[in-house]
Amino acid sequence: LRSLVGSEMCIRDRYTVASIDELYLFLTNTTAVEYIRNFMKRVRKKESSVILASQNLEDFNIEGIRELTKPLFSIPTHTFLFNAGNTDARFYIDTLQLEESEYELIKYPQRGACLYKCGSERYNLIVHAPDYKSKLFGDKGGR
């Protein structure tokens, strides 16, 4: 991961995006978490970004790793937050540094509804997929 993504993003002058899906697979490795955190800070200087994707916020709340993962939520300049599911509300609010009013916008599941954070600005978004994408992903939560 480090050599492939690092060299690719550093060789290009700018506008490169890397995505890490199923992030929970890396969270038990402190070296990987530190690398991801440092990498996220460096790529911003090249107008590039790293997209982190995880289904469960509680995966970041592992004893001994919590202190390393918390900064991952303050680094991104753009954040899309969807309904938290069964995650404890206080934990969700504290971890993602939300106001109560922001949490209220995504407290209940609504198809396509999310809170978009961009710097100090907040937007309540409804994401719509074009028909051709809806056919690809279906209407059963991505299946």
Task: Put a short name on every predicted segment.
Residues 13-15, 47:
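A general structural motif
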Residues 15, 21-23:
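Walker B catalytic acidic pair
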Residues 39-125:
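Conserved ATP-driven motor cores of ASCE-family P-loop NTPases powering translocation/secretion/packaging/pilus
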Residues 1-6, 10-11:
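Single conserved hydrophobic/aromatic residue that forms the stacking wall/gate
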Residues 126-143:
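Charge-patterned, long linear interaction tracts outside catalytic cores
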Residues 25-36, 61-64:
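Conserved ATPase-coupling elements of RecA-like P-loop NTPase cores
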Residues 18-19, 52:
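Residue-level marker for buried hydrophobic side chains located in beta-strands
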